[in-house]
């Protein structure tokens, strides 16, 4: 069994070692040399260096290739178009994963090499310990035989020199003592022979250095491969996150990784070939490195340990053992004879010590015989050889393959990475810009621009009015593509808000204006001029003009009714008299003339708009109705084909597009401000269809307080203001009686015509204050949110209740108004070609000329006026009208398709004749009609005169009240 184990437990050369050993070994002159492992031979080391230079050559080639590629990229200054780097990123990711796998393989090979080297070192330590033990045992045996037994034998010989009677026994005693001494010498020589060759064997230095190198190599290799893994991870992160910085970092560090990988490949290749050469015949390497004192046969015996070979130390051990046995036998004879011959000498202890030393020496020889056996040394040799040539060499080869593959992959990765990051644009830094202002327009530079901005609303490209600008909250967003903005939770509140009108910047809740009502300094000047002209005109002329104007209006209304219904879209009404007592004005005829001229301009504009837009019906009331000759239309007129849609779906416009609706070139304007102001000032109520108006209610409502004096105080120079104020106070008492007379006459005529047109009257429905209160609260909240209301700064205390309101631009600079006289406009109106075709309104720039106060109107939410029953046949059946700025307002008629058209331009003679008739006509019914200082006078005349040079432009296509555009003073 032992022979079989000895036979099967032999070293076999691994296949990897054979392959590596088969590699050609060339010197510097490219001559093939012996491939035997000779680490101390320079030629052999030269051949290993040449083999290791192959990866170094590949390193140089790869670096040159990368260098040329980078040079071409650096020299290429052409702008690169947008290029898809998805394929490059995918390829780079795949190569990176493969490189990580190669690095992992290198880590596995490093662990195998580490384990193989540990086995070699462990086996070497065991062999070294065994040799040391044999050497120590032989040394102890030799010391015992030489230093302890031999001196005792010498002492015994001295004792035996004493004379004795039995010479024969004495001679036999000396012979046995000499045999003991001789055998001890033989045993000592045998032990010395065993120890002598082992004295030069010492692997302690080799093992210690091996431990040190392995302690550095293994963690160093792990750290290097881990660093490569980190670089691969950086590359993967850069590819995943499209990071230009990470890719550039890998490009720089990748060059170092490529260099290190190729250098490690060369080192591993040389080491692998060397270990392969060693593993072909490790015993021969041991023989070549064995000390000179160690015989070759001894080393080969221990490395091969063949059963047929004799142990070189066994013979000497056997000789030593035989010598000790002979010495012990002889010592026994000596003890027997000496004890008989020398009884009184005390030899017993000495003889016992010699026997004890001989026995210990024999035991040492027995142990030494077991130590010098080749089985233990051969086992350790096989363990070391297998650990190095099988596990260690395999791990080294794996590291060689891993480093070679990693070097190639890293070279590819660096090239692809360098080709990839040039197509990744650097991320643009965020520009340091100021936060945009939430006010969509800059503040006016001076007071004039502020006033122009306050009087003018922006228009869009179609000439229609754009929504107002409401600033003061940063939550207000710019208009989106949506056509409608649902701002309120309830439909009725939203409808009330839509009926309200637009707001200007910084307006108080009560300052609701229509887009076209541009009252301001220009209007104040026009009012003052009209007052002066009225004061200079005779009463007869004014009465004649007023009478002629009323007749012309009646004729025009009848012609309009015969042609097909109401014509104008925009109805301008005379303003209320600015003074509470019209009877104080004596020169009412002059004011009436001026008012007739102003009303003539409105008539021209109504005719133009009527011929462009045609006849429309009222969306709110479809029942046909008629208007009296002195009445005006206060409802919006909407095309008949859109009225059912609007009635069913409600107003499709948001609250920030109130009163402005464009459909097939038509503009529908509604205003809620007039009703609210009339209600707050105690003005007239809106008549309904089914409630007859009360005469007492009509007469007890006073006109609104005067605003003429306030405008004169604010906008006129001090001298002009004082003169104008004195004239105004002198004329108040004279004009009041005449104006009252003309107003009664005008009211009788309107009631007669209204009784003919409308046989049925309705009761007066008081204006509801619920909707007015909601509108006022909404306006107040908007006013609180205004930035101008807070002194140009946003006040966080006020929470805006309206979101998503559009912020259109307001014209920054107002151009100078174009001067056109009223006579030029009259001439243009006469030469204009009228057309009954429905046309889109002309594109008009924002009004930049002096404006006149258009007439006060009603609101679209009030029902149409009823037809009053005949109160008195003696006065011609004049119905009780509604006082609305001095004119009887007919919010609706009996026929929706029949409307009174505006009168044609009056001639001067006709104007005077009309005013004469109006002055002579008695007030039969005794009703006083307040209309701004004269029956039918427009703009609250009576406080001044209108010059011919003053410009009175046509009003823009919208309906407004007399409220002023206000700019809150900061």
From Swiss-Prot:
Compositional bias ranges of the Pro residues kind: 852-868
Q: Where is this region: Disordered?
A: 532-587, 677-763, 849-970
- Biased composition (Low complexity) is annotated at 532-571, 689-700, 707-737, 745-759
Signal peptide range in chain numbering: none
> Could you name the domain of life of the organism this protein comes from?
Eukaryota
Bias class Gly residues marks the residues at 883-894, 931-945
Q: Which UniProt keywords apply?
A: Cell membrane, Chloride, Chloride channel, Glycoprotein, Ion channel, Ion transport, Membrane, Transmembrane, Transmembrane helix, Transport
**GO CC annotation, single:** endolysosome membrane
Localization of this protein: Cell membrane
| UniProt biased composition (Basic residues) | 572-587
- Enumerate composition-biased segments (Polar residues): 961-970
How would you describe this protein's topology in the membrane? Multi-pass membrane protein
**Residue ranges annotated as Cytoplasmic topological domain:** 69-89, 241-246, 417-970
Q: Which residues are glycosylated?
A: 27, 34, 136, 166, 183, 359
Entry annotated with the keyword Hydrolase = no
Decide whether keyword Chaperone is in the record: no
| Residue ranges crossing the lipid bilayer per the database entry | 48-68, 90-110, 220-240, 247-267, 396-416
Give ranges for the Extracellular compartment.
1-47, 111-219, 268-395
Main function: Non-essential protein that probably acts as a chloride channel.
> Which family would the database say this protein is a member of?
Belongs to the tweety family.
Name of the protein described by the UniProt record: Protein tweety
Q: State the organism of origin.
A: Drosophila melanogaster (Fruit fly)
* Upper lineage: Eukaryota, Metazoa, Ecdysozoa, Arthropoda, Hexapoda
């Amino acid at each position: 069994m032992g022979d079989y184990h000895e036979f099967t437990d032999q070293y076999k050369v691994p296949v990897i070692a054979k392959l590596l050993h088969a590699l050609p070994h060339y010197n510097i002159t490219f001559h093939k040399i012996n491939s035997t492992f000779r680490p101390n031979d320079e030629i052999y080391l030269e051949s290993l260096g040449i083999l290791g230079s192959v990866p170094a050559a590949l390193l140089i080639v790869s670096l040159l290739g990368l260098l040329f590629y980078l040079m071409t990229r650096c020299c290429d200054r052409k702008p690169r178009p947008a290029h898809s780097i998805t394929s490059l990123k995918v390829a780079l990711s795949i190569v990176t994963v493969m490189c990580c796998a190669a690095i992992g393989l290198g880590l596995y090979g490093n662990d195998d090499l580490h384990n193989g080297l540990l086995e070699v070192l462990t086996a070497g330590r065991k062999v070294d310990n065994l040799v040391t033990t044999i050497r120590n045992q032989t040394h102890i045996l030799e010391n015992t035989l030489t230093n302890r037994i031999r001196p005792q034998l010498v002492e015994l010989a001295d004792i035996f020199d004493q004379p004795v009677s039995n010479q024969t026994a004495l001679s036999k005693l000396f012979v046995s003592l000499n045999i003991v001494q001789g055998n001890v010498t033989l045993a000592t020589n045998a032990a010395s022979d065993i120890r002598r060759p082992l004295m030069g064997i010492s692997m302690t230095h080799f093992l210690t250095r091996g431990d040190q190198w392995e302690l550095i190599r293994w963690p160093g290799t792990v750290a290097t491969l881990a660093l490569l893994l980190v670089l691969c991870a950086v590359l993967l992160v850069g590819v995943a996150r499209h990071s230009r910085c990470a890719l550039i970092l890998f490009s720089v560090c990748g060059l170092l990784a490529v260099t290190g990988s190729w250098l490690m490949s060369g080192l591993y290749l040389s080491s692998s070939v060397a270990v392969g050469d060693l593993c072909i015949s490790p015993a021969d390497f041991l023989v070549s490195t064995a000390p000179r004192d160690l015989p070759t046969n001894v080393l080969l015996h221990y490395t091969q340990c063949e059963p047929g070979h004799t142990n070189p130390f066994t013979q000497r051990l056997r000789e030593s053992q035989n010598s000790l046995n002979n010495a012990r036998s002889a010592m026994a004879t000596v003890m027997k004879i000496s004890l008989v011959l020398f009884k009184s000498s005390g030899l017993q202890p000495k003889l016992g010590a010699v026997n004890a030393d001989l026995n210990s020496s024999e035991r040492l020889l027995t142990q030494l015989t077991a130590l010098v056996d080749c089985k233990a040394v051969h086992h350790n040799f096989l363990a070391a050889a297998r650990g190095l040539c099988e596990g260690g060499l395999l791990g080294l080869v794996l590291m060689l393959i891993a480093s070679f593959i990693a070097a190639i992959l890293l070279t590819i990765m660096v090239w692809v990475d360098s080709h990839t990051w040039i197509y990744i644009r650097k991320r643009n830094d965020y520009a340091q810009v100021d936060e945009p202002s939430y006010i969509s327009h800059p503040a006016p530079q001076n007071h004039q621009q502020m006033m122009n901005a306050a009087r003018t609303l922006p228009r869009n490209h179609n000439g229609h009015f754009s929504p107002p600008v409401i600033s003061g909250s940063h939550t207000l967003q710019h208009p989106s593509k949506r056509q409608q903005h649902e701002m309120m939770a309830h439909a009725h509140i939203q409808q009330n808000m839509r009926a309200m009108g637009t707001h200007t910047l910084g307006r108080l809740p009560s300052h609701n204006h229509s887009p076209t009502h541009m009252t301001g300094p220009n209007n104040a000047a026009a009012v003052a001029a009209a007052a002066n002209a009225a004061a200079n005109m005779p009463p007869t002329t004014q009465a004649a003009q007023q009478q002629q104007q009323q007749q012309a209006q009646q004729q025009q209304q009848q012609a309009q009714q015969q042609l097909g219904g109401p014509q104008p879209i925009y109805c301008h009404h005379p303003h209320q008299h600015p003074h509470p007592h019209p009877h104080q004005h004596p020169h009412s005829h002059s004011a009436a003339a001026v008012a007739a001229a102003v009303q003539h301009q409105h008539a021209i504009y109504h005719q133009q708009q009527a011929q462009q837009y045609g006849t429309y019906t009222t969306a709110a009331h479809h029942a046909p109705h008629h208007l009296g000759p002195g009445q005006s239309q206060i409802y919006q007129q909407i095309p008949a084909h859109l009225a059912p849609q609007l009635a069913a779906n409600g107003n499709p416009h948001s609250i920030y597009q109130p009163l402005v609706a464009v459909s097939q070139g038509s503009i529908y304007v509604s205003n809620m401000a007039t009703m609210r102001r009339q209600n707050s000032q105690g003005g007239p109520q809106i008549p309904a269809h089914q409630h007859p108006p009360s005469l007492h209610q009509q007469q007890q409502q006073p006109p609104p307080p005067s605003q003429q004096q306030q405008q004169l105080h604010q906008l006129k120079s001090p001298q002009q203001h004082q003169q104008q104020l004195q004239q105004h106070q002198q004329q108040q008492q004279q004009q009041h009686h005449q104006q009252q007379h003309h107003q009664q006459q005008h009211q009788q005529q309107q009631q007669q015509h209204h009784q003919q047109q409308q046989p049925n009257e309705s009761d007066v429905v008081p204006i509801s204050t619920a909707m007015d209160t909601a509108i006022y609260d909404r306006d107040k909240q908007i006013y609180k949110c205004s930035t101008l209301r807070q002194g140009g700064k946003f006040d966080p205390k006020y929470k805006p209740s309206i979101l998503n309101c559009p912020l259109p631009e307001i014209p920054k600079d107002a151009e100078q108004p174009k001067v056109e006289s009223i006579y030029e406009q009259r001439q243009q109106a006469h030469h204009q070609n009228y057309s009954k075709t429905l046309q889109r309104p002309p594109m008009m720039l924002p009004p930049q000329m002096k404006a006149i106060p258009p007439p006060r109107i009603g609101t679209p939410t009030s029902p149409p006026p009823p037809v009053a029953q005949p109160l008195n046949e003696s006065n011609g059946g004049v119905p009780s009208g509604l006082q609305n700025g001095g004119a009887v307002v007919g919010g609706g008629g009996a026929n929706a398709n029949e409307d009174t058209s505006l009168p044609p331009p009056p001639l001067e003679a006709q104007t005077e004749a009309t005013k004469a008739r109006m002055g002579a006509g008695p007030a039969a019914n005794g009703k006083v009609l307040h209309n701004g200082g004269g029956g039918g006078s427009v703009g609250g005349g009576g406080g001044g005169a209108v010059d011919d040079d003053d410009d009175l432009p046509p009003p823009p296509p919208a309906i407004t009240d007399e409220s002023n555009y206000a700019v809150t003073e900061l």
